[in-house]
Design a protein with these regions (language model features):
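Residue-level marker of positions within ordered structural domains that often coincide
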Residues: 15, 22, 40, 52
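Catalytic core segments in nucleotide and nucleic-acid processing enzymes
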Residues: 21, 32-47, 90-95, 101, ...
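Domain-level recognition of nuclease-like catalytic cores that cleave nucleotide substrates
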Residues: 54-109
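Class I S-adenosyl-L-methionine-dependent methyltransferase catalytic core
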Residues: 2, 29, 42-58, 67
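Short capping loops/turns at secondary-structure boundaries
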Residues: 24, 28, 40, 71, ...
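Glycine-rich, often proline-containing surface loops adjacent to acidic residues and nearby aromatics
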Residues: 11-18, 47
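Short beta-strand-loop-alpha-helix junction that forms the active-site gateway
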Residues: 18-27, 56
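Active-site metal-binding core of divalent-cation-utilizing nuclease and nuclease-like domains
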Residues: 1-13, 26-33, 40
């Protein structure tokens, strides 16, 4: 579903789903605003956002890219991960829209 503001990745059976893996963290603001708008208009009942858990950084610090650089440089603190999402949920940027936040951690990597 597309709004005048932002695309949601998937919409099915009144559930909006978005996967944010390594985008700039402002993407969460757009996702939450879109889900909030859809919820307020009665188009969805819940939003689901999947992102990285903080403990995945332990793996990224050890893994190297093709140039021998630590992957943590690519997956830094300004990109999407659970800590950036929870801050926004605690600030109620989702309005009244229920959000299921899922963090993919190192045990799932």
């Amino acid at each position: 579903m597309q709004s005048f503001l932002h695309n949601i990745d998937f919409l099915k059976n009144r559930v909006a789903f978005d996967l944010e893996w390594n985008s700039k963290d402002q993407t969460f603001d757009r996702d939450l605003l879109a889900m909030r708008t859809y919820f307020d208009c009665g188009l969805i009942d819940v939003g689901v956002i999947v992102t990285r858990a903080e403990n995945l950084n332990e793996i990224f610090k050890k893994e190297l890219d093709s140039r021998g650089q630590s992957l943590i440089k690519k997956y830094g603190s300004s990109t999407t991960w659970m800590g950036k999402l929870l801050y926004r949920l605690d600030s109620r940027r989702n309005g009244g829209c229920p959000i299921l936040a899922i963090g993919i951690g190192k045990t799932n990597y």
